[in-house]
Amino acid sequence: MPTKPYHVNVHELPRQSRFGGLMEETAVVMDGALLKFSWAKPADLGMTGRTAAAGKPDVHPFDQVIFLVSGRVEVTLGEGDDAETFTLEPGHLIYIPADMPHIGRVLGDEPAFGVDVFAPAREDYFDMAEHQLALERAAT
């Protein structure tokens, strides 16, 4: 895990594009957690994590918090009759327990920007934090 301080402007970090350019992401790793920064454009398609097909709920063994900075996002937790849908606006957060199916989509015409926290750190997302991890390796 990183041992060096890391100061950056997240809007200037390299981003990975998903869903045909509808979403861009980058990440920063901490000891025990990963912060993912997401920029998403409005679309009818439900956006989810890497492990699920587009439009299908994501399920993973990590606790997750989504904090919405700008835009409006609809998040559905659970599936079928047990599903519950929430609307997030700037300043809202939602906690998603590990192994809970979830999917989200941007509402309205305005893009959304949010911060996701995954604990423990999602190693399958470390490639999004390569900008940080490369500096860490170079310092040792």
Question: Where is each model-derived feature located?
Answer:
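A short, N-terminal "cap"/entry segment at the start of jelly-roll beta-barrel domains
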Residues: 1-39, 44-49, 55-56, 132-140
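Short beta-strand His + acidic residue motifs that chelate non-heme Fe in jelly-roll/DSBH
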Residues: 75-76, 96, 101-108
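Structural motif
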Residues: 34, 65, 72-74, 101, ...
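Short, conserved beta-strand element in jelly-roll/cupin
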Residues: 40, 59-75, 117
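Short beta-strand segments in beta-sandwich/barrel cores
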Residues: 45-48, 54-55, 71-77, 93-94
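Double-stranded beta-helix
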Residues: 103-140
